């Protein structure tokens, strides 16, 4: 298990300690780090909803460093980002690959960014299934529907034609922060605050 730093604050009522992520949550900063999976998605969704209830007018900052992961878990986060009232600013630190890149692009228009040496990668959804031929066919049809949806949403967020997205996600497509900006996945490359 990773060591999580603690922050100690002095108040008029004494000292109070927080883990670093809880302290940053008070500043409306959420970290999406590691593989996108159901437990992580539930935590991110809960934090988004909590921050909306605290102040529905103030932006939320979502920092992303992820190799990607589960499409359904990622879509839970994405749909919540689109559903809540506050704008969600996205910032790639390190990498945003696969579902991580999709969530990066899903931030509020004009408020999506990456640090200069971040890497972004888009591709088609991965899937695998074993079983009876008819069940394999059902799962193949489902993954094609998911691919269609992801490509439609990427086209919407990037401004790229659907056909371009379809071509560019056929295989792993790695981009620098500047390339991701030119492609429309992000709006800016941040060097300094």
Swiss-Prot record:
Pfam families referenced in this protein's UniProt entry, alphabetically: CLP_protease
EC number: 3.4.21.92
Family: Belongs to the peptidase S14 family.
Molecular function terms from GO: ATP-dependent peptidase activity; ATPase binding; serine-type endopeptidase activity
Organism of provenance: Mannheimia succiniciproducens (strain KCTC 0769BP / MBEL55E)
Protein encoded by which gene: clpP
Reaction(s) catalysed by this chain's protein: Hydrolysis of proteins to small peptides in the presence of ATP and magnesium. alpha-casein is the usual test substrate. In the absence of ATP, only oligopeptides shorter than five residues are hydrolyzed (such as succinyl-Leu-Tyr-|-NHMec, and Leu-Tyr-Leu-|-Tyr-Trp, in which cleavage of the -Tyr-|-Leu- and -Tyr-|-Trp bonds also occurs)
Chain's role: Cleaves peptides in various proteins in a process that requires ATP hydrolysis. Has a chymotrypsin-like activity. Plays a major role in the degradation of misfolded proteins.
Taxonomic lineage from the root: Bacteria, Pseudomonadati, Pseudomonadota, Gammaproteobacteria, Pasteurellales
Keywords assigned by UniProt, alphabetized: Cytoplasm, Hydrolase, Protease, Serine protease
Protein name: ATP-dependent Clp protease proteolytic subunit
Major localisation: cytoplasm
